[in-house]
Amino acid sequence: MAAAAECDVVMAATEPELLDDQEAKREAETFKEQGNAYYAKKDYNEAYNYYTKAIDMCPKNASYYGNRAATLMMLGRFREALGDAQQSVRLDDSFVRGHLREGKCHLSLGNAMAACRSFQRALELDHKNAQAQQEFKNANAVMEYEKIAETDFEKRDFRKVVFCMDRALEFAPACHRFKILKAECLAMLGRYPEAQSVASDILRMDSTNADALYVRGLCLYYEDCIEKAVQFFVQALRMAPDHEKACIACRNAKALKAKKEDGNKAFKEGNYKLAYELYTEALGIDPNNIKTNAKLYCNRGTVNSKLRKLDDAIEDCTNAVKLDDTYIKAYLRRAQCYMDTEQYEEAVRDYEKVYQTEKTKEHKQLLKNAQLELKKSKRKDYYKILGVDKNASEDEIKKAYRKRALMHHPDRHSGASAEVQKEEEKKFKEVGEAFTILSDPKKKTRYDSGQDLDEEGMNMGDFDPNNIFKAFFGGPGGFSFEASGPGNFFFQFG
């Protein structure tokens, strides 16, 4: 708000005038004094009324217009104030305060160059005027902020633009252009509530402001409320048919909505290849639309998971959470892909993030399941040791044991180096452990459920794999390995 401006006193006329003129001037002076009194009490509306009465009585008095301009400035009505200030200096070009008020109005409205001209004229009339000197510096500062902001906007350094506009608005509080630029940059930074607030304030004063309508639409567009956004873009284009930014945004919004809907339709119909292509095309429309693009990445990740391209699905979900780190659905999708690829630590991390954000029973159970799989993954994988899947039958487990036990039996590697013998002995023991657990339904159930087998009284530390081997192949002395045949050994039952 502009600083309170001083009111001017009209000197009595020195030359005799007609009685009617003198009475009019006396009455006008009375109205002016009443206006001054209300101004001093900060009742600017009443002050405005009395200054207007004074002007009606004496429309050629420059100071009356100057006083009313000062009052309008205090009411924040800078455009009207500018008209009065300009009229005051038209009537009296030597009226320093008139030039100061004209410059102050120009500056408040964001026209810093015009403000400089007014302040320069005031300094020509009174070169020692401290207010004119300071206001001239302020106007030049605003021009510098404008220049920096223009360059930084081209560089997409939106934070710097917001900073410059905040500084400029300290001197130009009524400049819609600065406010709109700030609001647009706030929207580009994802600070939508702040941007909406600035645009809404302007629209309350001017409901036809195309720039403000565009910014309102831009915020909705970036918040993925595309239908509502299009309505604002269309309204902005009605107000200003040549509004280039609104035109581009409207076109992008419609294209993005159509591609996304087509992709969703293809996905529901099970046409995953087409859905992938459509989501990919949608992602190329507007890289600035972070929220919508996060959803598109997540959708494409879901498609990739359906196509069993799990690494690609993980990458898409990662891109989604990079754009929107609060996007729960993307974390859940990525966590499931991590589970499917046995990356349990990563899955636990994602489920922990989800559960910290939304503490539901479902999310808690997903986290517990991932933690269990992580615990199980750190034990020996007996299925992998035998080379069977988790649904292997009893016969398949026996066949696998026979094959692996013979493959790793120490006698078969008696001629190998000490290092190889040690490694094969270790593998032979693990094969026996695996068979002991997986061939026993109760032990297998406990193993599959992730229970600590040692705590269940099945400590494998003293386990002797030879006992299993002998029992499996028919007792002691019932087998031997010799260097013979293509396999360099032969097996013989007793």
Swiss-Prot record:
GO terms for biological process: chaperone cofactor-dependent protein refolding; protein folding; regulation of cellular response to heat. Changing R333A: Impairs interaction with HSP90AA1 and HSPA1A/B. Abolishes interaction with HSP90AA1 and HSPA1A/B. The gene is DNAJC7. This is DnaJ homolog subfamily C member 7. Associates with complexes containing chaperones HSP70 and HSP90. Interacts with the GAP domain of NF1. Interacts with HSP90AA1. Interacts with HSPA1A/B; the interaction is enhanced by ATP. Interacts with HSP90AB1. Interacts with PGR. Interacts with RAD9A; the interaction is interrupted by UV and heat shock treatments. Interacts with HUS1 and RAD1. Interacts with NR1I3. The DNAJC7-NR1I3 complex may also include HSP90. Interacts with HSPA8. Changing H409A: Predominantly nuclear localization. Abolishes interaction with HSP90AA1 and HSPA1A/B. One of its GO terms (cellular component) is cytosol. It comes from Homo sapiens (Human). GO terms for molecular function: ATPase activator activity; heat shock protein binding. The lineage of its organism: Eukaryota, Metazoa, Chordata, Craniata, Vertebrata.
